[in-house]
Swiss-Prot record:
It is found in: Cytoplasm. The active site is at residues 89, 151, 180. It comes from Staphylococcus haemolyticus (strain JCSC1435). Pathway: Carbohydrate degradation; 2-deoxy-D-ribose 1-phosphate degradation; D-glyceraldehyde 3-phosphate and acetaldehyde from 2-deoxy-alpha-D-ribose 1-phosphate: step 2/2. It holds the Pfam family DeoC. InterPro entries: Aldolase_TIM, DeoC, DeoC/FbaB/LacD_aldolase, DeoC_typeI. It is an enzyme of class 4 (lyase). Gene3D superfamilies: Aldolase class I. CDD domains: DeoC (cd00959). This is Deoxyribose-phosphate aldolase. Its main location: cytoplasm. The lineage of its organism: Bacteria, Bacillati, Bacillota, Bacilli, Bacillales.
């Protein structure tokens, strides 16, 4: 198993500097991660630096609250792709989900999927804010809207991925969608728990530590 290809090497802190972006780009090239995930303001620079590297550029839409309008999310998506993004991680309208306005939630996702024009779309449902029933419904809506992944968390809402949530989401979407676990995945042990639960992508700022943990474990 190529562990690095499961990892979206992530830096989404609002205070991220160009120097820090350079660091994760260099690490992504060195370890051959699947992608780097950065805020939209860094996409164009990252895409230029990662050109022909094999490392994808992922960005976030409606992040971290999911509370912007669908039109805004569509514009953000189109702008990100124009700047070189190849994967889109969007946040659902969490309040609409809790209201039971499921059509609004699905249309919001569909808007981003349409704007992405074939690029990979991962739908962040923010599991820490949801009941199990809501997690299932959100996953079903992501599936119905034509997304590629359902994703656990932004990492900004006070909780992250759990193996239990990953399994619930995977059981809901089956083989039609993949599951991305993000938020709090900091070690090889965490990584393995998420993969065992059904995740096929891991969003982590600790990608290097995870891979180094793998390397150190392989010495025994």
């Amino acid at each position: 198993m190529n562990y690095a290809k499961f990892i979206d090497h992530t830096l989404l802190k609002p205070e991220s500097t160009r120097q820090q972006i350079d660091q994760i780009i260099d690490e992504a090239k060195e370890y051959n991660f699947k992608s780097i995930c950065v805020n939209p303001t860094h996409v164009k620079y990252a895409a230029e630096r990662l050109n022909d590297s094999g490392v994808l550029v992922c960005t976030v839409i409606g992040f971290p609250l999911g509370a912007t309008t669908t039109a805004t999310k569509i514009f953000e998506t189109e702008d990100a792709i124009k700047n070189g993004a190849t994967e889109i991680d969007m946040v659902i309208n969490i309040g609409a989900l809790k209201d039971g306005r499921f059509e609004d939630v699905q249309k919001d996702i569909e808007g981003v999927v349409g704007a992405a024009n074939g690029k990979t779309v991962k739908v962040i449902i923010e599991t820490v804010l949801l009941s199990d029933e809501e997690k299932v419904k959100a996953s079903e809506l992501a599936k119905a809207a034509g997304a590629d992944f359902v994703k656990t968390s932004t990492g900004f809402a006070g909780g992250g991925a759990t193996p239990e949530d990953v399994k619930l989401m995977k059981d809901t979407v089956g083989d039609e969608l993949e599951v991305k676990a993000s938020g709090g995945v900091r070690s090889l042990e965490d990584f393995n728990k998420m993969i065992d639960a059904g995740a096929t992508r891991i969003g982590a700022s600790a990608g290097v530590q995870i891979i180094q943990g793998l390397e150190s474990d392989s010495d025994y």
